[in-house]
Curated annotation (Swiss-Prot):
Membrane-topology descriptor: Single-pass membrane protein
Protein name listed in UniProt: Potassium-transporting ATPase KdpC subunit
Highest taxon, organism lineage: Bacteria
Cellular component terms per the entry's GO annotation: plasma membrane
Keyword Ligase: no
Claim: Membrane is one of the keywords in the record: yes
Sorted UniProt keywords: ATP-binding, Cell inner membrane, Cell membrane, Ion transport, Membrane, Nucleotide-binding, Potassium, Potassium transport, Transmembrane, Transmembrane helix, Transport
Entry's localization field: Cell inner membrane
GO MF terms, alphabetically ordered: ATP binding; P-type potassium transmembrane transporter activity
Main location: membrane
InterPro entries: KdpC (IPR003820)
Task performed by this protein: Part of the high-affinity ATP-driven potassium transport (or Kdp) system, which catalyzes the hydrolysis of ATP coupled with the electrogenic transport of potassium into the cytoplasm. This subunit acts as a catalytic chaperone that increases the ATP-binding affinity of the ATP-hydrolyzing subunit KdpB by the formation of a transient KdpB/KdpC/ATP ternary complex.
Pfam families for the chain: KdpC
Length: 185
């Protein structure tokens, strides 16, 4: 029996060492050398070097002077990320969407873009379609006393055109550009 047990335990120990320590350390080392920004969470820093967030995770921007992200089912917390799992026929979902639509419609004119009313699958999508952000321009322009045309140009500069899929804008990057614009002013 020892003849069978010893090789099995040796292999289990070896594979534990390789797959549990050596391989993860090797991949981490390669990632740190080849892709240091992505390996460390795609952190976004301000001019003073302070971390402002991650380019991969949405944030809850408050106040009329900022572009707002789409709603989050998990309160923008990475631990609670995920969809609300409420069906389209669920009254709680209908009430939340109606409340959000009423709030947004009071501040603007015209129909509210769907992206401002619906959560993403992860609840943390940092991107919005340009139309959803263009809808917010009058509110942000009024709060910051900036010309609408300047914010439209800023939005155009921040719009990403991926190879596959529609154009998107990273809301954190757009708000950082907005912050820099206020400093320059």
């Amino acid at each position: 029996m020892t003849a069978y047990l010893r090789p099995a335990l040796s292999l289990a120990l070896l594979m534990t060492l390789v797959t549990g320590a050596l391989y993860p350390l090797a991949v981490t080392g390669i990632a740190q050398v080849a892709f240091p920004n992505q390996a460390n969470g795609s952190l976004v820093r301000d001019a003073q070097g302070q971390v402002r967030g991650s380019a991969l995770i949405a944030q809850d921007f408050q106040g009329d002077g900022w572009f707002h992200s789409r709603p989050s089912a998990g309160a923008y917390a990475t631990v609670a990320s995920g969809a609300s799992n409420l069906s389209p026929s669920n009254p709680a979902l209908a009430e939340r969407v109606k409340g959000d639509a009423a709030t947004l419609y009071q501040a603007q004119q015209g129909p509210v873009p769907q992206a401002l009313l619906t959560t993403s699958g992860s609840g943390l999508d940092p991107h919005l379609p340009p139309e959803a952000l263009a809808y917010q321009i009058p509110r942000v322009a009024a709060a910051r006393q900036l010309p609408v045309e300047r914010l439209q140009a800023l939005l155009e500069q921040a719009t990403l055109h991926p190879l596959i899929g529609p154009p998107v804008v990273n809301v954190l990057a757009l708000n950082q550009a907005l912050e820099k614009l206020a400093i320059v002013r």
